[in-house]
Amino acid sequence: KEFIVPLPEQVIRDQASRCMECGIPFCHDMKGLKGCPVNNQIPDWNDLVYRGEWEQASKDLHSTNNFPEFTGRICPAPCEASCTLNIVDSPVTIKSIECSIVDKAWENGWIKPQINQKKTDKRIGIIGSGPAGLAAAQQLSRAGHNVIVYEKNKKMGGLLRYGIPDFKMEKTHIDRRLEQISAEGVQFQGGVELGVDVEINDLLKQHDAVILACGAEKPRDLDIDGRNAEGIHYAMD
């Protein structure tokens, strides 16, 4: 089970009220700034939470992020490190607010399949079912394409499922989102490994486009002094 206890709604709204005391929101990943990598409109949905407009906050949050329940739990939160309140105080608890928004959206049934009735008849293959592959699948399906996701493991999710422990993010969050994506028309094929069960040239013939979202499972070594010391392991081990 996740070890983080959700904050009460009033505490979340109080935290959201601390936002926008800055002239320039450094929490955005603007040119020259190192804030949110996906450009979440953080001040906007913080203000909506402060006003109690949770459903609109969810729409705003999902406009830039397909899976805020994932990032709200496991993202290192460069937005909080960039918050200008760090100069005089602690930053706004942006991750906690993000989690609260999406969790409340699920609880209230605001997150529903978005099905495009106008199909393009284009067939798209996606290799890998991690967050990048799933986000691409969802967006392309909503654009009207026929999308098939191929995953070497039996279950979908990539490192979200096989690399993130339950105490940081429970698998129910992945399964719930997969149900939504499947309802939107995306097909999933597990136990299919590229280069073993299927060749890339065959996939290229079968699809109008193929996306490689295989992830970064192979660690990168560092040729630096002290690398051979005891107790140093790859993060992927």
Question: Where are each of the predicted segments found?
Answer:
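Feature captures the FAD/FMN-dependent oxidoreductase FAD-binding
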Residues: 56, 118-119, 123-127, 175-224
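Ferredoxin-type iron-sulfur electron-transfer modules and their immediate structural context
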Residues: 1-123, 171, 210-236
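Short, well-ordered alpha-helices that flank and scaffold nucleotide-derived cofactor binding pockets
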Residues: 103, 138, 142, 237
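Rossmann-like dinucleotide-binding cores of NAD(P)H-dependent redox enzymes
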Residues: 146-149, 153-190
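N-terminal Rossmann-like FAD-binding beta1-loop-alpha1 element of flavoenzymes
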Residues: 123-148
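Residue-level detector of alpha-helix initiation sites
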Residues: 66, 130-132, 155
